[in-house]
Swiss-Prot record:
Top enzyme class: lyase
Keywords attached to this entry: Cytoplasm, Heme biosynthesis, Iron, Lyase, Metal-binding, Porphyrin biosynthesis
PROSITE patterns: FERROCHELATASE
Annotated pathway: Porphyrin-containing compound metabolism; protoheme biosynthesis; protoheme from protoporphyrin-IX: step 1/1
Gene: hemH
Subcellular localization: Cytoplasm
UniProt EC number: 4.98.1.1
Record organism: Actinobacillus pleuropneumoniae serotype 3 (strain JL03)
Gene Ontology CC: cytoplasm
Protein name: Ferrochelatase
Length: 319
């Protein structure tokens, strides 16, 4: 063990290995089998998942992935690699003995394998940074579960720090604000990934974090209450999810006199299928077809300098 080397584990959701039906099916099976994501009784849910959902959804989702796939592969993985390298470069410039690894809750590279690489490199401490600014049991807690699994075969568990959330971190808020320049008569819509309403009732304070993030950004930009709103996207299944829903809101705004909209997905640290296809394409078409005149998607923070600096400072506070 190198007593001076610090390990950093960047963690995100994950992606299929390739945009094919078999690869997407494997990915969705792992993702949707996580009880943190879907907490229905296991036997009942596995029957529904294997015999009703995967066969229908996998080809459709694979087609959507093919539309956003790049030469570097999945946008989420490519951008996450850029974030990993940018943070490694940052710590190298600071002459800090820090090793940054990347792991995904589902798919490759896994959080378990990233944890193993850090331990084999001899780090004396691991700082786990889930790239989810707003805590949720469906995302952040899944990272903790996977990290714990990565330690199960270790005789010596090194000390670790787990960054729970950073929804109100000043540098993160400033990084978001720096990407937003509203045009005249343009309304700002914060679209966060949804979760079942029941999860909030049972104690998940994710929606509170989302509202706080949006309010802080709006305050930073000196926006009035009429200039912005919060919605939730990507609902799945028949259960009620957090509302208002992004798609329904965008379809009704033009009839309420809102003709110009800018959409930012502040909970996504990297652009992915949900932002590049669902928000930037599908919902744009719906808004314009409903009578909207201008629709602008503001990209995720990805590997931009302000974002990397904000993440680096979060990590440095734990070193």
């Amino acid at each position: 063990m190198n007593t001076n080397k610090i390990g950093v584990l960047l963690a995100n959701l994950g992606t299929p290995d390739e945009p094919t039906t078999p690869a997407v099916k494997r990915y969705l099976k792992q993702f949707l089998s996580d009880p943190r994501v879907i907490d229905l009784p296991k036997f009942k849910w596995q029957f529904i998942l294997n015999y009703m959902i995967l066969s229908k959804r996998s080809p459709k989702v694979a087609k959507l992935y093919r539309e956003i796939w790049t030469e570097q592969g999945s946008p989420l993985l490519a951008i996450s690699r850029q974030q990993q390298q940018a943070l490694q470069d940052y710590f190298n410039r600071q002459n800090q003995n820090v090793l940054v690894e990347l792991g995904m809750s589902y798919g490759n590279p896994s959080i378990e394998s990233a944890t193993d690489r850090l331990i084999k490199a001899g780090v004396s401490k691991i700082i786990v940074l889930p790239l989810y600014p707003q805590y949720s049991s469906t995302t952040t807690a899944s990272v903790l579960d996977a990290f714990a699994r990565g330690l199960t075969q270790q005789r010596n568990i090194v000390p670790f720090e787990f960054i729970h959330s950073y929804h109100n971190d000043p540098l993160y808020i400033q990084a978001l604000a720096n990407t937003i320049q509203l045009a005249e008569d343009e309304k700002l819509l914060f679209s966060f990934h949804g979760i079942p309403k029941r999860y909030q009732t049972e104690g998940d304070f994710y929606p509170e974090h989302c509202q706080q993030t949006a309010q802080l950004v709006a305050d930073k930009l000196s926006l009035t209450d009429e200039q912005w709103l919060v919605t939730y996207q990507s609902r799945f299944g028949d259960e009620e999810w957090l509302q208002p829903y992004t798609d329904e809101t965008l379809e009704t705004l033009p009839s309420q006199g809102v003709k110009k909209i800018a959409v930012i997905c502040a909970g996504f640290s990297a652009d992915c299928l949900e932002t590049l296809e669902e928000i930037a394409e599908e919902n744009k078409e719906n808004f314009l077809n409903a009578g909207g005149q201008s629709y602008r998607y503001i990209p995720a923070l990805n590997a931009n300098t302000d974002h990397i600096n904000a993440l680096a400072k979060l990590i440095e506070a734990k070193i």
